[in-house]
Amino acid sequence: MNSNCQSLAEKSVSQPVCIVGLGLIGGSLLRRLTAAGYPAFGWNRSASTVQQAAADGMDVSGDLSATLQRAARENALIVMAVPLFALRDIVSQIAAHAPQCPLTDVVSVKVEVLRIVQEAGLAATYVGSHPMAGTENSGWGATDPALFENATWVVMTGGADDVTARVRDIAVAAGSVVVETDPVSHDGAVACISHVPHLVAEALSVAAVTESVGGGDTALRL
């Protein structure tokens, strides 16, 4: 490794990451970054999840205020890895305890998250993101440090350059391929992608019914 690459890697690893929410996505990211040598730490509401993560060697806590205060002291990139319905409460806690920290999230919709962040006065330090990865399982037991390998990680445009750089950095460290777009385009594309399997299944069902027994008009009404 040449000196420039080495110094860049050392700079990246030296930047702390605080992951709020240790389900499949947040927990997998914590495991991946910890294995890569990042000073990564996390929080989860569930005591059992905290215990499991700690038993696996992770730096975790069940005290959200203390975790966010630590993030503020260390200028950690805060990754909000909670469901959309829980996001507003988390954002309000970040505004109270770590308002200057760079901020991102991994929620699958971006326009609504941006609105919540703007209402809390945190837009200047926020860059949304969405790793296009997952499984049918959930919880700490389902976490996998290889979950993001070769997956697309979408990073939103329009944010501060320094925050964008840190979000891109963790995406690359997770093994993902970074794609940039704006929140509106992202949400439109994700909506289309999510509907494709249903549309294909419906088309195949209609074709099968029409070919085998006729009655295409009836099939289309179902």
Sequence positions of predicted segments:
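NAD(P)+-binding Rossmann beta1-loop-alpha1 motif at the extreme N-terminus of oxidoreductases
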Residues: 2-72
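Residues at the starts of beta-strands that form the adenosine-phosphate
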Residues: 16, 39-41, 125, 152, ...
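Hydrophobic Val/Ile/Leu positions in short beta-strands of Rossmann-like dinucleotide-binding domains
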Residues: 18-19, 80, 155
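Short phosphate-binding/catalytic loops that engage adenosine nucleotides
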Residues: 38, 58, 99, 175-177
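Residues in the short beta-alpha loop(s) of Rossmann-like NAD(P)-binding domains
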Residues: 45-46, 107, 159
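Rossmann-like NAD(P)-binding element
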Residues: 67-102
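Rossmann-like NAD(P)(H) cofactor-binding subdomain of soluble oxidoreductases
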Residues: 90-141
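Internal alpha-helical scaffold of NAD(P)-dependent oxidoreductase catalytic cores
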Residues: 145-222
